[in-house]
């Protein structure tokens, strides 16, 4: 499982977001016992997914906790919120690209998918917010 968690702390700019993402990817690589040579975020995530699948013989499961928090933390500053949206799109676009290597993706957040333009590449999202099958 690859876990991407934005729940902790407040990210104030794109540089902080990118650093957090790089830290998260590094932690996942260590946990899964894989390495990568890529230097950019999409390359690192793509390689992490592929190498995890190759090592464990199973397609990856990706958990994204609070997928929209970096945007919502900056909602009162539209230019920064826009930078955060672009940074997250840079990350999430890899998930569509790696579809063949991913079993499923589970995302939590506050905003409805259709209200956030992060997922133009992901066309198979299912909102289970009010589904009885997933209630506790």
List PLM regions with ranges.
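Phosphate-binding site recognition
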Residues: 1-136
């Amino acid at each position: 499982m690859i876990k991407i968690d934005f729940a902790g702390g407040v990210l104030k700019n794109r540089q902080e977001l990118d650093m957090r993402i790089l830290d998260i990817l590094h932690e996942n690589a260590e946990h899964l016992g894989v390495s990568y040579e890529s230097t950019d975020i999409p390359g690192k995530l793509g390689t992490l997914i592929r190498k995890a699948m190759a090592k464990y013989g199973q397609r990856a499961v990706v958990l994204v906790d609070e997928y929209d928090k970096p945007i919502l933390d900056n909602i009162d500053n539209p230019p920064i919120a826009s930078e955060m949206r672009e940074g997250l799109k840079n990350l999430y676009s890899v998930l569509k690209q790696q579809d063949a290597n991913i079993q499923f993706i589970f995302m939590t957040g506050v905003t409805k998918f259709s209200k956030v333009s992060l997922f133009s590449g992901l066309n198979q999202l299912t909102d289970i917010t009010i589904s009885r099958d997933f209630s506790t």
